[in-house]
Amino acid sequence: MLAKLPSFENYSYSCTEIPNTVFFNRIYFLNAIYLVPTLVLNIWIFIILRIRHADFYKNNLTFSIITLDTVVAIIHIFLDLSVVRLFLYFPQFCPQFSQYFINYPIINDIIFPLYNYCRVSKTVTQSAIILSRLGCVKKPMKSDKLSRKLTPLIIPTTVFLPILVILNTVISKKEVVFWYGGFFTIYHRKFVWVSLSSLHLTFLFFAIAIFIFSSIMIVRHLPPHNELAERNCIIHAVLAVFGFSLQGFFQSYYALFRFQEWFPDFVIHGQFVIYDVMTVG
């Protein structure tokens, strides 16, 4: 799901026949091997938090944010498996289904912003979770009271912030384009100076800074000799910073070089794996 027209050699304006259709089908199935279990796991987590034990978790800020993160992950993976990667990696579907997206632009008006919202949301929810944990560690005796007080404020804020990043995709014109036999969507920015890549990159920088700062503060405020908690906190921080850094490198690379003739094709495929690090992790 790209921001503007790139200069790919195999880019076209209609479905094209390619000899290695099975190769791209296999890419989809390889992605599905880890995305389907992740989808099932997120659905199970949601059932636990909001159905089976809703009374226990509903007033806890951290678990409320985790619930939000889980819902977004479910939507994200569902869109990947049923729309985005399906129609990119299955050229067999291109002639029929691309026409639906072209003739009924409302489909892309909904799916394109929603998909990018899910991508950005992980940056916000993970930052909110680590800040919530920091609050629990610094003020353990008041954590329940603070949780009940802050939940009505934090949850709407966490939902709203990603909208700032994807707002230009909501109001901009979308276009169906064709690549390697499949198709996907781009948008032509209504406000040229507002880039999805640059805004997301800004959020990523803040998320990395928040994770590093919060993790250091959590370790400092943990009870002495609590090595297991310290190790888990450090591992979580390292993995999160690594995942966000990968996204940051991609957004930087894409923002700087996407219009160059030598821009490599594998970057489009690689972006899915980069974002999957945080979705699956």
Language-model segments: what does each one mean?
Residues 1-281:
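Seven-transmembrane-like multi-pass membrane architecture, highlighting hydrophobic TM helices
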